[in-house]
UniProtKB/Swiss-Prot annotation:
Pathway: Porphyrin-containing compound metabolism; protoporphyrin-IX biosynthesis; 5-aminolevulinate from L-glutamyl-tRNA(Glu): step 2/2. This is Glutamate-1-semialdehyde 2,1-aminomutase. Keywords: Cytoplasm, Isomerase, Porphyrin biosynthesis, Pyridoxal phosphate. The modification N6-(pyridoxal phosphate)lysine is found at K265. It comes from the Bacteria. Belongs to the class-III pyridoxal-phosphate-dependent aminotransferase family. HemL subfamily. Its cofactor is pyridoxal 5'-phosphate. PANTHER family: GLUTAMATE-1-SEMIALDEHYDE 2,1-AMINOMUTASE, GLUTAMATE-1-SEMIALDEHYDE 2,1-AMINOMUTASE 1, CHLOROPLASTIC-RELATED. InterPro entries: 4pyrrol_synth_GluAld_NH2Trfase (IPR004639), Aminotrans_3 (IPR005814), Aminotrans_3_PPA_site (IPR049704), PyrdxlP-dep_Trfase (IPR015424), PyrdxlP-dep_Trfase_major (IPR015421), PyrdxlP-dep_Trfase_small (IPR015422). It comes from Vibrio vulnificus (strain CMCP6). SUPFAM superfamilies: PLP-dependent transferases (SSF53383).
Length: 431
């Protein structure tokens, strides 16, 4: 038995399921999760000392690579001055100014401690600002584990949402409407059936929680137009895409200006940080300047702010955005080409520094229903083959994978060599 397997057994005695976030348990791929001992650059090292080229990157934050020296030193320096004050600091101002400069639609913003907290607060603000209760999300898009957002679609676009987790009251879930991603008609139908009742649309501009699904042409423009016509706010959940799809986020990549934006992951440089912000007139509605309450003891934590500021300062250096996108495209194109050579049907999507692939005969993947038609069992097999070959991909067919600036040509080519061998095994097994 490996040390990771031993630790997993031990963890299950005191931690529900042995993990502190469900996807880490490998339920989506089977087997026991690897327990990580340390990480550096493009690599993670498990409890048995085995190295893996990492394409999870802590689910997105590690855009500069693991254990970056500048971020590490920023954390140490900040920690030496104190871990938490519960009072405002100058670094919070510097951080807010930098984020607003990089993401201009965020005229004002507030720091929180997680992406879930950011989306939860943005939803409350949208409801308070508009005086409306209902929100619209998309099937397959994940926005954290707040009650309003743990809802899936019913049978048909006009069906009221049903809770997808015990503990979410149906009476509460009914205020969440679910449309089909990349389908503007489903959005229009919901607005028509709930005239004057919808406070906001919240959307992952690139859906990263049903793997990696970009918007079809005109989709985000259509959402912007519908919100303007209906008096609803458009919220871009850029927890995953922020600073990764482009330096200014997916909204810069697609040239769309949302009313509110939520951020997480990259903004903390590996520390627990989230943020929400947007138009000044909307943000002024949050306490203490407005009636919508939001607070947090650790919001704007000085150590987390130092890490985030160091990360974004490095990330904005000239050439980094293009370099990240270029190496990710090279990797994605390589996966697609190798799969084709071995006769493996594969759809590969890539935007900026995130990518995903689907084992399917379908020509393209545009929504959650398309994802459910993919060969999940073949993904599981491929995942474990890649693990055996020293490559760590997202352990779920419904999660995107990520590159970092620390992934060099050596790591990319080693990954493609591993993929070549794994596709060959899949092809042989299917004969």
């Amino acid at each position: 038995m490996t040390k990771s397997a031993e630790l997993y057994q031990k963890a299950q005695q005191t931690i529900p399921g042995g993990v502190n976030s469900p996807v880490r348990a490998f339920n989506g791929v089977g087997g026991s999760p690897i327990f990580v001992e340390r990480a550096d650059g493009a690599f993670i090292f498990d409890a048995d000392g085995k190295a893996y080229i990492d394409y999870v990157g802590s689910w997105g934050p590690m855009i500069l690579g693991h254990n970056h020296a500048v971020i590490r030193e920023a954390v140490i320096e900040a920690a030496q001055r104190g871990l938490s004050f519960g009072a405002p600091t100058e670094m919070e101002i510097k951080m807010a100014e930098l984020v607003s400069e990089l993401v201009p639609s965020m005229e004002q913003l507030r720091m929180v401690s997680s992406g879930t907290e950011a989306t939860m607060s943005a939803i409350r603000l949208a409801r308070g600002f508009t005086g409306r209760d209902k929100i619209l999300k998309f099937e397959g898009c994940y926005h954290g584990h707040a009650d309003s957002l743990l809802v899936k679609a019913g049978s048909g676009a006009l069906t009221l949402g049903q809770p997808s987790s015990p503990g979410v009251p149906a009476d509460f879930a009914k205020h969440t409407l679910t449309a089909t991603f990349n389908d503007l008609d489903s959005v229009r139908e919901l607005f028509a059936a709930n005239k004057g009742e919808i406070a906001c649309i919240i959307v992952e501009p690139v859906a990263g929680n049903m793997n990696c699904i970009p918007p079809v042409e005109g989709f985000h423009e259509g959402l912007r137009e519908i919100c303007d016509q209906e008096g609803a706010l458009l919220i871009f959940d850029e927890v995953m895409t922020g600073f990764r799809v482009a330096l200014g986020g997916a909204q810069a990549h697609y040239n769309i200006k949302p009313d509110l934006t939520t951020l997480g992951k990259v903004i903390g440089g590996g520390m627990p940080v989230g943020a929400f912000g947007g138009r000044k007139e909307v943000m002024q509605y949050i306490a203490p300047t407005g009636p919508v309450y939001q607070a947090g003891t650790l919001s704007g934590n000085p150590v987390a702010m130092a890490a985030g500021y160091a990360c974004l300062t490095l990330l904005r250096e000239e050439g980094n955005e293009k370099r990240l996108a270029s190496k990710t495209k090279h990797l994605a194109d390589g996966f697609k080409s190798l799969a084709a050579q071995h006769g493996i049907p594969l759809v590969v999507n890539q935007v900026g520094g995130m990518f995903g692939f689907f084992f399917t005969e379908q020509e393209q993947i545009t929504c959650y229903e398309d994802v459910t038609k993919c060969d999940i069992e073949r993904f599981k097999r491929f995942f474990h083959l890649m693990i055996d070959h020293g490559v760590y991909l997202a352990p779920s067919a419904f999660e995107a994978s990520f590159t970092s600036l620390a992934h060099g040509s050596k790591e990319i080519e080693a990954t493609l060599e591993a993929a070549d061998r794994c596709f060959a095994i899949l092809a042989a097994e299917s004969k």
